Amino acid sequence: DGNSGFGLATSYTDIKPIIKPFSNGLQDLIIGEDPFCPEKLYEKIFKLTDTRISNEKGWSKEALIRISAALDIACWDLIGKASKIPLYKLFGGYRNKIPVYVTCAYYRDGKDEKELKEELKKLINIGHQSFKVKVGGLSIKEDAKRLEIIRDEIGAEKELMIDVNRGWDLKTAIEGVKEFERFNPTWIEEPVRWEDDRRSLKVLSKKTQIPLSGGESEITIFGCRSMIEEEAIQILQFDCTMFGGFTNGKKLSALCELNHLDI
């Protein structure tokens, strides 16, 4: 009928395995489905992750998780366009503004203090008020020096968030949060390594007043639910393009509200 929806998925690995299912049959399971029933389509594709057909055709679990998320987002985009109602209103219309931050201060070989300061000045000049910066690739002492520069440049009033990208073991994380408390960060994101992150996050949260965030690297809503239930984090950061789409994003939002967690 001429309606279309746009969806996307995020992947940090080779995208060829994610494209593959569309070349050997997955499209036949999608064509003809009702886009106004996004949860039904999502479940249909997601449940293929544990089936004989996916094994026989070489559809990886990651591919199906990403595809189901992208399809769900596309369905919701189509629903919004067809109804001529923006999704924020379809989802309840609780707010019409959202806070934003800029992710910056990435590591790069040869990047010196002068370049870091210039980067921050440019971001401030175009109006940014909240800054998320990267740590975890250097020693605590070296990262603390970078954070001193960053805090001095942005000032005491602007928000500073710290993203470790799962770069620390628990011992280093405990040292890091103690050292970084003086920078008054809004949160520290994914501070510990992946293999025992929920247990480590719970231990770490008892060692600091800085809110801990996580969830971005989970691959299902159930992993996020476990983080909430185990009281491992104070802020849930899930990525609808990594898994779940908007359908499961709404579920996680409700779960956070019921458990008094921020998103």
Predicted feature locations:
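Tryptophan-centric aromatic hotspots in well-structured domains and transmembrane helices
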Residues: 76, 101-103, 107, 128, ...
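Catalytic core of soluble alpha/beta enzymes
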Residues: 133, 138-263
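N-terminal small/glycine-rich loop or linker at the start of catalytic domains
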Residues: 88-108, 146, 153-157
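Catalytic domains of carbohydrate-active enzymes, especially glycoside hydrolases
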Residues: 119-134
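Conserved active-site and cofactor/substrate-binding residues in soluble primary-metabolism enzymes
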Residues: 17, 21, 36, 40, ...
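Short, charged beta->alpha transition segments
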Residues: 86-90, 115-122
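Active-site mouth loops of central-metabolism enzymes
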Residues: 97-115, 135-136, 164-170, 213
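Metal- or metallocofactor-binding catalytic centers and their adjacent structured scaffolds
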Residues: 3-82
